[in-house]
Amino acid sequence: MAIDVNKFESMQIGLASPAKIREWSYGEVKKPETINYRTLKAERDGLFDERIFGPIKDYECACGKYKRIRYKGIVCDRCGVEVTSSKVRRERMGHIELAAPVTHIWYFKGIPSRMGLILDMSPRSLEEIIYFASYVVINPGNTPLEKKQLITEAEYRQYQDQYGTDTFDAKMGAEAIKELLAEVDLEKQAKELKNELKDATGQKRTRAVRRLDIVEAFIQSGNKPEWMVMDVVPVIPPDLRPMVQLEGGRFATSDLNDLYRRVINRNNRLKRLLDLNAPGIIVQNEKRMLQEAVDALIDNGRRGRPVSGPGNRPLKSLSHLLKGKQGRFRQNLLGKRVDYSGRSVIDVGPFLKMNQMGLPRQMAVELFKPFIYNRLIELGTENGGANNLRSARCLVERHEDVVQDVLEEVVKEHPVLLNRAPTLHRLGIQAFEPVLVSGKAMRLHPLVTTAYNADFDGDQMAIHVPLSDEAQAEARLLMLAASHILAPKDGKPIVAPSQDMTIGNYYLTTEEAGIKGEGMIFSSADEVKMALQNHEVELHTRIGIAASSFDKAKPFTDHQRARIMVTTVGKVIFNEILPDDFPYINEPKSENFNGIDDRFFLDPGTDIVGWFKNESLNGPFKSGFLSDIIAQIYARYQVTRTSVLLDDMKDLGYDISTRSGLTVAMSDVTELPEKGEVLKEAHEKVAKITKQFRRGLLTDDERYIQVTQTWSDAQDKIKSMLIASFDSKNPIFMMSDSGARGNISNFVQLAGMRGLMAAPNGKVIELPVTANFREGLSVLEMFISTHGARKGMTDTALKTANSGYLTRRLVDVAQEVIVREEDCGTDRGLDVSAIMDGNEVIEPLYDRILGRYAMKPVIDPKTGEVIAKKNQMIDEHVADQIIDAGIQTVTIRSIFTCRTEHGVCVKCYGRNMATGDIVEVGEAVGTVAAQSIGEPGTQLTMRTFHTGGVALSEDITQGLPRVQEIFEARNPKGRAEISEVTGKVTSIEENPADRTKTVTIEGETDTREYVLPISARLRVAEGDEIHRSEAINEGPLDPKELIKVSSTLKTENYMLAEVQKVYRMQGVGIADKHVEVMVRQMLRKVRVMDPGQTDLLPGELLDIADFRRANAKTILSGQTAATSRPVLLGITKASLETNSFLSAASFQETTRVLTDAAIRGKNDPLVGLKENVIIGKVIPAGTGVAEYRHIKDEVVAAPVEPLEKIPTLDELQKAFDKEPASSTGNKASNSAK
């Protein structure tokens, strides 16, 4: 039963009726037996019966009368087994006919209880009926009893005696519930509930809305309420609940078999009791046990104690197979293990080019096996190859020489994918061309380590081989490492020289005064290199070189070209790796990128040695400047030239750092003679502070602050003394100054003092570590040092887990956001200006407008000239002009105002940060946004800081907790009150008794009072004007409150600014658009306030797009439209409220999502990525976008060239003989067919 998943448009789920379950089934399972312990064959009518589920061996019936494929489809007359493939045992279902109906625990136990809502009964009453504790009146007849009234056993008997046995009808158990459900008139109930809603309020209204929701769901889905009670239980295929023999003759079996066995045993016993006309109480007890057995099968542990197996371990039921990280969704559908993959330790490969990786031969043989076999067969025996698959296999197993030759051929230009877990962003998987290496470790290019966050201390990486031609083409065109130069989060280069490469280039471009060969003048770069080889000059020597000797394309002015340029030997060598028409880089300044300064050019005949004596030295090129050069090259010359430059920079860096012979020794850590003096002063000051405290002049908090401040000042003093005494040739200084490794504080700890340490609770210990590592620490100092360090380690571990979970939730909520069209045609934009925090600029305007489209023309206020037209992309040049013109606010196209459904349009998104080009239709921008926000999560702090000073012990939540608070739309800590009216602050009263203060605001129509804690810092004073939605006191706003009193756009803008504050404070840059995508996803739902004449329900939560559609339909037919208000959902809630039940079920609360979806008969439109991955369909992003899928079909259907001659029978026969061997390689098998 092969289904082509790429053919269907959507997937629907619903309640299965008993008839449907019987239709699925291939037979009834009547016995609890599994397999016979002697013959090891499946028992007849048992849980593994071959007659029901199909043969255990391929094309062979149970008794062995029919064997081989030629009997396919025949049902054996002896054993009744159909001769077919054993794969059917993965798809054929059976069923159990129950002797008494049982309820489905999902619909009775879920919150809210679906049965309870339909029947208008409490879950407790339902439980009493279902588990045979009480009777329920089904038909009161002419007695004073009421329908659905609960009566106890004793009352039932009493009423029977009182009114007679046939006057009323009361039952217990699931059959009673089934009868009640079957009697429900949904249409009538819906009508009554709608009338009730007109005047109901409070709790009553809430319950009515809930009930109406469920009733409408049943009406629209066509599900019948009585289907929530089962007469038949489906039995899943046996290969999904296998039983395998272990060594030693014991069997391991799936828990489900035990659970099914309990159901069958109890069901059979109940049948027997009913046949025997057993007493009611015994039958009741058996029915209750059957109900409990089915409950345990569906969801063990949901009610009462879970059924446990050996060793008191709870058995895994059907629900558990779907739930959680080990469930079907997350373990087998969203993440599968694949063939043609491997993993190994990685090692550095400095000899590789940017797009290469070193693949160990041993791994390559294993990974490329099908291609090797195919090539060996193509070669044929006459060329040392093979004739068929078997002999090809032998050649490979015997490690024949020909295999290595073929391997070289096969691997050539066949890209492979490398992945390092955790894959935090799209650069966690990149494509490389394999280069065969010896050994067992894969070799990785040193420059891609940043993107992978890899190092060579034992990290492992996974490798995958793309098999099809399309997959190889995509890997080559879209995923080659050489084209991944920019980070998707901020568009800055992520590939930059580090460590040895940085220090090499730093050393190369260092200048020294008065060394060998200073002032020599050369006619060309070659001459300079020759002089260096002959030891006439050194790398750092300042020299002159004829500007005319450089390439014509070098952007020198004519005046400069006729003169002598002063530079150093190293800089001449460095500039050789830059493109010919790129300015000569002589000093580490960004102005140099537009051309070299005239001061570096001297007229021929000038006394160059004398000129050098008066000229100060230029700084060497540090890590940051090297990154700037890469960014410039990328902007001007695109990918290919940049990757060439990177490789050259890497080779040059390694070469020079090796030649420089930089080492670190104890003698490089200089001692500071003045240190003792500084410490003495500090000790005296601390003694003075302690004295004042003892006299009662200071509080303990003040004393603590002053003491820690004293030691902090002492450390700063030592630090500045150290920096002053530094020798610029000191290797440790060079390492930190160049940005290769370490920073100044490391040096201070080596040569100065370690300073103050933090305790595990984050508080600073007031006893400082006065020693440094050169002197060595005392026992107490050592203890103080390690005390806080331990906290650092545990924090990091916790942070990683928290950050990973945040990323998972972000990805889930945004995975359906894909660039779906060119232009959505919106008429709204977003006014952006620099994000400020007080007077501090958090994110400048330049960063916010770069790579976005202008919504309105941007006009220079001074000249009136148009800098950017409407819908024009703002690139670096335009952005510079806007900033230079002094413009403070620009209206841009924003994702917040984009009207594209399930995604965004190109114009509202703008530039793709990872490529620097305009985003393409099909780009999965939601996932990229989620990863961009989640990836730096581990760099954020975990702590809640105390602000300085004693008076303000107000906690500020920062770092990861603050980001979570914003995205989960939680009530923020220490939040500010928001004014709900525009008016004047008339009074501020303090009430010391209850430690509050009351702020009164008088608006035009009403007066509001706000009670705040006494410690709150107010933003307003008496007599101030205040606008609606402004904060009354300091602190973060609650976005859920803000959205009630201001516009959606204002709320979105506030959340964007808050997220940016957290990341930018920690020095992490993230493009606005990523945050915009997330915030928009949190605000895509509205709640219906008044449904008007639409089919919507009051209080219903639905997508803005669906709401607009419903209204448009109503307005067109001249009826009253519905009204709604926007709802802000946290990312977890938003993920679960998605239109795709597959995506929601695979995220969290699997059973709840599926219960709800089944009742509503939900249809999953398969618009997001996750739901398509789950069903194995090509995802609707990238080359899987519908538009591109059709193009592919046209290409395939290109006219076929006529065959030159029709093949003879012999030729065909030969082709078929070869076929099994070549079926692994595409070309050969296609031609054979």
Swiss-Prot record:
Cofactor note: Binds 1 Mg(2+) ion per subunit.
Cofactor(s) for this UniProt protein: Mg(2+); Zn(2+)
This enzyme's EC code(s): 2.7.7.6
Gene Ontology molecular function terms on file: DNA binding; DNA-directed RNA polymerase activity; magnesium ion binding; zinc ion binding
A Pfam family: RNA_pol_Rpb1_1
Keyword Iron-sulfur in annotation: no
Keyword Nucleotidyltransferase: yes
Stretches the record annotates as Disordered: 1211-1233
Reaction(s) the record says it catalyses: RNA(n) + a ribonucleoside 5'-triphosphate = RNA(n+1) + diphosphate
GO terms for cellular component: DNA-directed RNA polymerase complex
Binding site for Mg(2+): 455, 457, 459
UniProt binding sites for Zn(2+) 1: 61, 63, 76, 79
HAMAP family per record: RNApol_bact_RpoC
Name of the protein described by the UniProt record: DNA-directed RNA polymerase subunit beta'
Naturally occurring in which organism (per UniProt): Oenococcus oeni (strain ATCC BAA-331 / PSU-1)
